[in-house]
């Protein structure tokens, strides 16, 4: 199916988390705690969605940090948490993102950002990273009252764009995001940046690549 509107996840997919990874090493002593935190954040957001808890990305991110610190007997001060989370607003794009996005834009593909970050945070991220001219729209799940991978988010994004959900494709570096989008009827592209495991029980992505340039080429080839 030809798809001329592509949605992009932001944290780790579009923006480089190297500064965040360094903070985790400084606080927790090992980079593996970053993925542990991501897993706990996903768990908390999923529980919040199912039980209809009204919360924000920032609140969940802070709680997830405190939780993994507590479980691993690591003392973490509130100012250290604030310092770590503030770095999300000043992340730079991954090296392959700009040429990959340019390739799509030059071929009349509409590109949009769709993130679990708050509306305020994602706008700060896109502005600081210099990506304003690369996304036609920037969408936070905050306006839908849920979090990815809830199907509601993907359906709501399609409705907001006045597009059939089947005409959209989601690009993400996280298997749960790709699976969530495809469960809702979108196409899915897995940008496997860090040799991450893709759950075999999830819907197989339409496209998989370890860099954005080749992934963009694959999207264009599917549209021919």
Where are these regions (language model features)?
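Asp-based, Mg2+/Mn2+-dependent phosphohydrolase catalytic module
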Residues: 1-3, 8, 102-105, 114, ...
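An amphipathic alpha-helix signature
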Residues: 21, 34, 38, 58-66, ...
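Active-site neighborhood of HAD-like aspartate-dependent phosphohydrolases
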Residues: 1-42
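Short, surface-exposed acidic
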Residues: 30-38, 71-82, 165
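Short, acidic loop-to-helix structural element flanking the phosphoryl-transfer center
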Residues: 58-59, 76-113, 123, 151
């Amino acid at each position: 199916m030809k798809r001329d509107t592509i949605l992009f996840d932001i944290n780790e997919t579009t923006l480089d988390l190297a500064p965040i990874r360094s903070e985790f090493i400084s606080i927790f002593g090992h980079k593996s705690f970053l993925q542990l935190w991501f897993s706990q954040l996903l768990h908390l957001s999923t529980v919040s969605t199912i039980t209809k808890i009204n919360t924000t990305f920032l609140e969940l991110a802070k709680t997830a940090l405190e939780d993994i610190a507590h479980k691993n007997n690591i003392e973490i001060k509130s100012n250290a948490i604030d310092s770590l989370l503030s770095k999300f607003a000043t992340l730079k794009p991954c090296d392959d993102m700009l040429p990959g996005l340019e390739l799509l834009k030059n071929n009349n593909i509409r590109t949009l950002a769709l993130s679990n970050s708050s509306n305020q945070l994602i706008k700060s991220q896109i502005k600081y990273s210099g990506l304003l001219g690369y996304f036609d729209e920037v969408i936070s799940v905050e306006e839908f009252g849920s979090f990815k991978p809830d199907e509601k988010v993907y359906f709501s994004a399609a409705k907001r764009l006045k597009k059939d959900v089947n005409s959209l494709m989601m690009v993400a570096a996280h298997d749960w995001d790709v699976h969530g989008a495809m469960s809702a009827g979108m196409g899915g592209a897995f940008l496997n940046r860090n040799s991450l495991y893709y759950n075999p029980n999830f819907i197989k992505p339409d496209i998989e690549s370890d860099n954005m340039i080749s992934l963009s080429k694959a999207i264009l080839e599917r549209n021919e």
